[in-house]
């Protein structure tokens, strides 16, 4: 018989550096999950990724306080910033542009995120990420 699901917890945790401090500790502590067990498992799963990369994670908590978790791909905004070599997006994206990015690079990001995105095809996902790039103040070339 399958375990009864008690809750889903969605967090964004930096790869390789999950620890019991907020936001991880309070979110898991409220549901009675073993926080250190999650931190060790998450850090082990993300050790090969770039250190400090924000990783969305969905934790499924069961009624017996056990858990499973699924990691997603990093946010498109993070991938765009690293591809363009920026620290942050533009505070005024319509008037103040902060950099440029090639359409080929955006398509590469769309293909990487294809598993987590909802879209008809890679072209539709590419257009979605182009919109994110423009809203960050990036100029799309090509």
UniProtKB/Swiss-Prot annotation:
The keyword Ion transport does not apply. InterPro entries: Ribosomal_uL11 (IPR000911), Ribosomal_uL11_bac-typ (IPR006519), Ribosomal_uL11_C (IPR020783), Ribosomal_uL11_C_sf (IPR036769), Ribosomal_uL11_CS (IPR020785), Ribosomal_uL11_N (IPR020784), Ribosomal_uL11_N_sf (IPR036796). This is Large ribosomal subunit protein uL11. Belongs to the universal ribosomal protein uL11 family. Keywords: Methylation, Ribonucleoprotein, Ribosomal protein, RNA-binding, rRNA-binding. One of its GO terms (biological process) is translation. The keyword Cytoplasm does not apply. Gene3D superfamilies: Ribosomal protein L11, C-terminal domain, Ribosomal protein L11/L12, N-terminal domain. Pfam families: Ribosomal_L11, Ribosomal_L11_N. It comes from Shewanella oneidensis (strain ATCC 700550 / JCM 31522 / CIP 106686 / LMG 19005 / NCIMB 14063 / MR-1).
